[in-house]
Amino acid sequence: MSSRKQGSQPRGQQSAEEENFKKPTRSNMQRSKMRGASSGKKTAGPQQKNLEPALPGRWGGRSAENPPSGSVRKTRKNKQKTPGNGDGGSTSEAPQPPRKKRARADPTVESEEAFKNRMEVKVKIPEELKPWLVEDWDLVTRQKQLFQLPAKKNVDAILEEYANCKKSQGNVDNKEYAVNEVVAGIKEYFNVMLGTQLLYKFERPQYAEILLAHPDAPMSQVYGAPHLLRLFVRIGAMLAYTPLDEKSLALLLGYLHDFLKYLAKNSASLFTASDYKVASAEYHRKAL
């Protein structure tokens, strides 16, 4: 089945919403804004560790931490350029200071490098499940079979059973909360990514039919285990769009790997070729 091209836009689809920030008109207002932003960062740390819900998934923390300080910096530069353009004889010298300040964008460059490094995040698929990924591909792309929809056991049911299984093991309250957040996040990412990143070309006509027949139904209530497994092949790329720190990301990956172990343990009942059926000749014409 799911590091950065959307934002969450699993490659092209998921995108984090940008917040609009009002620009202050006075320098003291700018300072107060910056102080407010810095105080916000202090509170964001523990919330990320608790995997607080945020778009594009539920693991993003507060994506608006950096934009406020960035917008304040741009405001300062613009204000410094304006008086320079108004000095009659010094107009040729005025543009020089802003150019020097552009060279001070080292922190931005460093953050971009860190961002690229986080694109290397990979979710490890258990060895027991890798053969099924191959068989799933073969059934659909080579044998031209389709997974029968709606699934006998849909994604929502699988996630609910996993959550109940973890809760029955007597986890502490905060761990139980984390499991609920992880399950909700997996479901959210699945519904967002399915249409653009989790389907083979041959399956797209079937997906279009599902949208017509169930326009208001989340795809997690229609599709099943094979497509859920495909999600974890691509979800590592989507995690690159979240501002989680290293500790929070490691914690999240631990929960995702635990869920994959659950899928591997129950693979015999979740993955079977009998859930596929050869597509009709009419469907083949649609898929061309």
Curated annotation (Swiss-Prot):
GO cellular component: NuA4 histone acetyltransferase complex; nucleolus; nucleoplasm; nucleosome; plasma membrane
Subunit structure comment from the entry: Component of the NuA4 histone acetyltransferase complex which contains the catalytic subunit KAT5/TIP60 and the subunits EP400, TRRAP/PAF400, BRD8/SMAP, EPC1, DMAP1/DNMAP1, RUVBL1/TIP49, RUVBL2, ING3, actin, ACTL6A/BAF53A, MORF4L1/MRG15, MORF4L2/MRGX, MRGBP, YEATS4/GAS41 and VPS72/YL1. The NuA4 complex interacts with MYC and the adenovirus E1A protein. MORF4L1 may also participate in the formation of NuA4 related complexes which lack the KAT5/TIP60 catalytic subunit, but which include the SWI/SNF related protein SRCAP.
Span list, region Disordered: 1-113
Source domain of life: Eukaryota
Taxonomic source organism: Homo sapiens (Human)
Keywords: Chromatin regulator, DNA damage, DNA repair, Growth regulation, Nucleus, Phosphoprotein, Transcription, Transcription regulation
Biological process (GO), any one: positive regulation of double-strand break repair via homologous recombination
Residue ranges, compositional bias (Polar residues): 1-15
Keyword set includes Magnesium: no
Record carries keyword DNA repair: yes
Protein's cellular compartments: Nucleus
UniProt-listed Gene3D superfamilies: MRG domain (1.10.274.30)
Function text: Component of the NuA4 histone acetyltransferase complex which is involved in transcriptional activation of select genes principally by acetylation of nucleosomal histone H4 and H2A. This modification may both alter nucleosome - DNA interactions and promote interaction of the modified histones with other proteins which positively regulate transcription. This complex may be required for the activation of transcriptional programs associated with oncogene and proto-oncogene mediated growth induction, tumor suppressor mediated growth arrest and replicative senescence, apoptosis, and DNA repair.
Residues bearing PTM Phosphoserine: 71
Ranges where the MRG domain occurs: 117-288
Protein name as annotated: Mortality factor 4-like protein 2
